[in-house]
Amino acid sequence: MPNYRGYAGVVLVAAATLNIWLLRSSEATSAFAGITFAALCLSLSCFFPLTDRDSEQPQAGLPPRRPIQTASPSAQMQTPPSQIVNAFTIDLEDYFHTEVSSREIDFEQWNAMPSRVESSVHRLLDLLDEHHAQATVFVLGWVAQRYPQLIREVASRGHEIGCHSYRHRMVNKLTPRVFMEDTRTAKKIIEDAAGVSVVGYRAPNFSIIPGTEWAFDILEQLGFAYDSSVHPVWHASYANTRAPRFPYYVAGTNLLEIPIATWRIGNFNLPIGGGAYLRLLPYSYIRHGLSVVNSREWQPVTLYVHPWEIDYLQPAIHSGFASHVRQHWGTRTMEAKLHRLLSSLRFAPIATVHAHSLSADPPVPTPAAERVPFFAQVS
């Protein structure tokens, strides 16, 4: 078959540009744009073979990469796709903690804001109970400090507790010292509230990006066993297209990285991991992409969601059309989409899905003088 990947790239970029332009128009045209973009992605998947970037050979001069499997390849191949257990994660924060909201609401104003986090979290927990599923819940330290009983309830209902920072500040905008203090504070508050040890971390807005690799060393120093802050797609806030798609030990550390789910077509990683992508794009596109990863690549996926994403009655505090779209659109249908996903796929916490990798002996860390930045490991 001729190599049409170059043409595919042009078409995808053009479609994405059209989608963004239409988003500035009306709800009807933006819906049309989303459907068109999703249909294009689905059609392209029929023509381009999936490639696993993580299995390719590294460039000359780079150390070999270390992919971490949740099971041996032979065991995975013997597991029917319908039996693969995926990781469901929740970033537990309130509607005024988001990056979009931070432009309108300062940290000093948080205590004065009407909170909706308890009701939204309870709805998510009930939804998970309905489908006999459990999740990893990455808790914002500020929320744990204000609502410790809520965090203890989450843990008592069988969910894994992780750390989502204290003040929801992007890591790439912090110094190493500030990041360490923020994370240390959050970890202690969350552990005290939940009554359990916290070994998993997720950065706000997936903000551990090229140039902030020092954050991995700090996380390891603070006692974390894994991180789930890498989303290997292009985004204005986190351009991580060169990062691995499947779990890795971060170079030079014993820290396991659990990336967010992506669907690979040609040389492109398409976002299918939840959040705004699940809210704004058609369900069929997300569901098909997840099925491709499970059935063709024999890999579990990691999804994420925020409690405020199922709360369409949250206050509208955002100025500007784009901000309103990012925070509010799709909140009326998000719960129904989650219900469909939980009905069709199996989910568990990260610590359960990747228990084999987390319990296995980690590789010998690379000497500091020989380290190559984590994000440079994938060509």
Language-model regions: role of each:
Residues 1-3, 78:
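N-terminal hydrophobic targeting signals that begin at the initiator methionine
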Residues 270-280:
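Surface-exposed cleft-lining segments at the edges of enzyme active sites
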Residues 73, 77-200, 205-266, 285-379:
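Catalytic alpha-helical scaffold of carbohydrate-active enzymes acting on polysaccharides/glycoconjugates
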Residues 40-58:
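Membrane-helix interfacial anchor on the cytosolic side
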Residues 4-26:
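N-terminal signal sequences
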Residues 54-71:
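Cytosolic juxtamembrane segments of membrane proteins
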Residues 27-34:
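Short, aromatic-rich membrane-interface segments at the entry and exit
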